[in-house]
Amino acid sequence: MLCLTFTNRAARGMKERIDERFTDRCMDTLYVGNLHRFCSRLLFDNDVVSEISTILDEDDVHDVIEGLLIENIPGGSRGRSLPGNAADYIMARSARLFQEANGFPEETFHRTPEFDVNKKNQDELDAFGLIKVDDFGRCIELDHAAIDAAARRYLEYKTAQHLLDFNDLLLKAWAWLDATPEACGRYAWIQVDEVQDLSPLQLDIVKKLWNDSIDRSVCVYFGDEQQAIFSFMGAKLDTLRALHKTHEIHRLYRNFRSPDYLLNMFNTYAQRVLECDPEFLPKAEKTVARPEGALRAIRTATPQSQLMLLCDLLEGRRPEETTAVIVPSNREADAVSAAFKAQDIEHFKISGSDIFRQNILKAAKAYLSVLKDDFRSAPWAQLVYRLSSKKNLSLKKIRDYLAVEFPRRGLLASDLMLYSTHDEKEPVSALEDFMRAYEGELVVFDTETTGLDIGLDEVIQIAAVKLRAGEVVERLVLYLETEREIPKMLGNIPNPMLEEYEAHRAELVTPEAGFKIFLNFVGYAPVVGHNVEYDANIVNAQYAVLKDQLRRVRGDAAGPDEDVDRTELVRRFDTLKLSHALEPAILKAAGLARLPSHKLKDLIAVLGLEGSNTHKADDDVEATVSLLRWFHAQARPLVELQRRFLSNPSVVRMSDTLRKIVLPMFLEHRNLMYRRMPAADEAILVQVFRQFIEALPNYTDDEGEIENIRKKLPLIYEYLDRVLINTTSQPTLYAQLQRNLVQINSLKEPDLCSSDIVRDRVFISTVHKAKGLEFD
């Protein structure tokens, strides 16, 4: 089953209604959300896009396109700023070019928004080389050749930098589904809300997902022709008319929300102005006498007198009711807000620059992203840019450094912060650190477990190989007792550990004995693994529980048992991270333009190395050793290049900024990543988010910005804690980031208003931002 709607707010409302009616745990697997987020999951889960890909928001798209245009203008853009609608136009053209090049049906082609040259934007467009003038200077129009050239550069740049905009989520999902017939028809039941707001491309994606070949398959669309508010995004009434021809129509006539006096007014407007057939207009269930003063059209002489009248009208409202002042534009919303402030009328304004687009919030969201995946360069670039008080480098320039120049030298963006550029005796990167460790003693290890929950699941197999200067000197394989059920399937394949575990049942050791043997085998050597954070943390977590249990049995008075209370896996190297540092070398050796993924099995396959990823720890360790040796051979010539490059003053400034502001918090929060927190406490993710934001005033010139949003920050914290994050099912920071980060990155201010955390009773909003909200 698949439940799709248009906005995060609508999806949350739909999920709440489902949870109220159904308590079955299988509902947790039901996808409820908007189509863009669904397509994002589809692309990442199926390795259609690189796991390091980053989704751009509107501001990022504007910055990228403006930066690309500036690079191609002799002498720069003369201090001009690219109009936002020009960036939108170029992005739309790039989507259209992608569709034309990839065989999309013409009816799904992306709609290019209307955009013309006028007196307000002429100078800016001219500065960016986007208009052409005839010989007499009288005929000025868009230079469509220049527009398309910019659109193509934008497409190429996104590919090179592993960037996606919101159009890409739909375009790449459609292209993959079209090229992969076996992936289509996954769902026997699909319901789509607000269908009038979906574009032909979105509807075609839904059709590809629906399995209409089985009995009782259902695809139901909910919508209203009169609510096509997002027509500027490509939604068309023609789409609804096409559905009328292929689907059975059910009209819902009973309106349970609006009182009859209000609905009658809307129906009159629909009939007389929109020329709707009265037969299809809804009937009100509520018969309510029109309150005094309701449904009035009031003429005022001046804009100022209108504002004063609004203030007077609000004095007579009921204090417990929510009141919305809906205006056409952000400018008018600002004027109303200023008038209310002058009259001490408490209110919440949804307009202008969304709070989640403010510098401080963008920095905080980038911090959460690098905390979850520290090998992705785009959030690091965002973090460096947002924290730099003097903005010496543009966001695009920083992104180019981290996504292009760093990989050429085997550097990770995280190296900027985790390693110092000032001490010649210390390593400057993860790769150099690994190279030094490789010359000594390393332990390559892997675990197999009963599941992925570090706090609850248990280790059932440990395999390890000890290397000295790259040569194998010792091996270890252990099978540990467990009372937990071993899963029968790993995703869509049978779990090989079921048979393996039974075959070695006679060799089982207790978890306590197994961990003692393994940790004594490791000693104080660094450990290596593919996605080693998971393996190291489940060992540390389970062993910590065993040590605590043993202490309670021994009694606090007993001294520490050296055999038990010895060590934990602290210093570790991750071949998953190293594979990102060496990706250019891997691609060159494999003759590929893009890796299928950074999974162990794919890396072994494309490089033709010995070993196989069978999901049995001993096999996986041997494969990791093969990979490790290949990495060592590739890394040696890169280390000197790294040192020269990292001495660049621009790179040093970026490193110093991160190490001064972020490093202490990052190390603290990373140590909390897998620690289970009490469900009654504020979500650990919210604590981390708050700590990061509260640390910023000491390091940024944007104190005015912080004051502007200070009122709304507590609402954001409360929203994340009470509405978004479920600490019962997500007890660790890692689980909370894994489950909620995508939604946090897509939050908008109106999302706060659709919950009960906003105590203000008066709201100011533009028409478009109020869609989906309800007021008394």
Place the predicted regions along the sequence by residue:
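Conserved helicase NTPase motor core
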Residues: L2, A10, Y31, D59-I65, ...
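Accessory C-terminal helicase-associated subdomains
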Residues: R376-V443, G451, K466, P649-S765
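Conserved helicase core region in the C-terminal RecA-like lobe
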Residues: G33-C39, I190-E194, F222, S329, ...
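Helicase P-loop NTPase motor core
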Residues: H247-E248, N255-I345
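ATP-hydrolysis module of ASCE/P-loop NTPase motor domains
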Residues: T29, V48-D143, Q161, N255, ...
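ATPase/helicase motor core of nucleic-acid motors
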Residues: R317-V428, K599-L609, D618-D619, A623-R676
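P-loop NTPase Walker
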Residues: M1-E51, P181, V325, A770
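Conserved non-catalytic scaffold segment of RNase H-like nuclease domains
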Residues: G440-V443, T450-D556, G591-S597, K601-V606, ...
